[in-house]
A protein has these predicted regions:
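Transmembrane alpha-helices and immediately adjacent membrane-cytoplasm interface residues
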Residues: 68-98
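Short surface loop/edge beta-strand patches of beta-sandwich-type extracellular domains
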Residues: 102
Length: 296
């Protein structure tokens, strides 16, 4: 479901009703309210002259009834300001997402609700996703949300491990960027609550940014070369891992749950035009509210 498109359509439809409400329907109701009030005052001039409170209240209710929006305008024009604010916030500032899988463990858990910054990587037109203003670019270590290159109706979340021009290598479960080993330290046990499997949690220093990764010793370090990657002349695979050089305007992204993540190793690079934004914090997890906070 393309929620951005649905929200855009709702904004346009309610906006049209709001314009007609302001320019046509509201002036009509005001005119009718004035006519009804004039007729009522003419018929009850004596009582109003005496200051009859009951008649005065009837006049007030008459005006309020004549000015009241019909239900179909309440649910269209009346909702437009709220829908417009949501649309603008979601399109240009922040968008919420829910983590559906364990591919980013131990950093992000299933059920985490995260907030994604929509402007760090440039201002884009809603729905079209066309960049109209350059702001910045993903850096190594950023957790990004992007449209899955194999099915752009689906959003993925992974960590950027290499940027355009970088040579990235994953060998024997260790990451190398431009020939430099991204050091791993402090191994300890980590239990994946969704599968009840014990993984090894390590701290990886990715170009100066320390973050947690999970290693599954039940799985090999190599991954089968998918058909899409066979077309990439800058990548090679062997029984110990792979080596890739990242093309311009593309990024290499991997899940922190290194052996249980379908990522750039399988389906290729993330194009710049597929970027949605940068994950900045966890704002809710209804199973564990203690997880609320920054993810860096």
């Amino acid at each position: 479901m393309n929620f951005a498109l649905i929200l855009f359509i709702l904004t346009v439809i309610t906006g049209i009703f709001w314009i007609f409400e302001r320019t046509v329907f509201l002036p009509q109701r005001r005119r009718k309210a004035e006519e009804a009030a004039s007729a009522f005052e003419a018929a009850n001039r004596e009582a109003l002259g005496r200051g009859d409170a009951a008649v005065g209240e009837d006049l007030r209710r008459l005006k309020a009834t004549a000015l009241r929006q019909p239900w179909w305008l309440e649910y269209t024009a009346g909702l437009f300001p709220v829908i417009l604010i949501v649309f603008l916030l979601r399109s240009f500032l922040f968008e919420p997402f829910r983590i559906p899988s364990g591919s980013m463990l131990p950093t992000l858990h299933i059920g985490d609700f995260i907030l994604v910054n929509k402007y760090d990587y440039g201002i884009r037109l809603p729905v079209l996703n066309t960049k109209v203003l350059e702001m910045g670019a993903p850096q190594k270590g950023d957790i990004i949300v992007f449209r899955y290159p194999m099915d752009e109706s689906v959003d993925f979340i992974k960590r950027v491990v290499a940027t355009p021009g970088d040579r990235v290598e994953y060998r024997d479960k260790v990451l190398y960027v431009n020939g430099v080993e991204q050091a791993q330290s402090r191994p300890r046990d980590f239990v994946d609550d969704s599968t009840m499997v014990t993984l090894e949690e390590r701290t990886e220093n990715l170009s100066g940014l320390e973050h947690s990764i999970a290693v599954d010793h039940r799985r090999p370090s190599w991954v089968p070369m998918q058909a899409v990657m066979k077309k990439e002349s800058t990548c090679s695979y062997n029984d110990r891992g792979f080596v890739c050089t990242v093309p311009e305007c593309k990024y290499f992204a991997m899940g922190d749950n290194r052996d249980n993540s379908e990522d750039s190793r399988f389906w290729g690079f993330v194009p710049d035009e597929n970027l949605v934004g940068k994950a900045v914090c966890i704002w809710a997890n209804f199973s564990d509210m203690g997880r609320i906070g920054s993810i860096y």
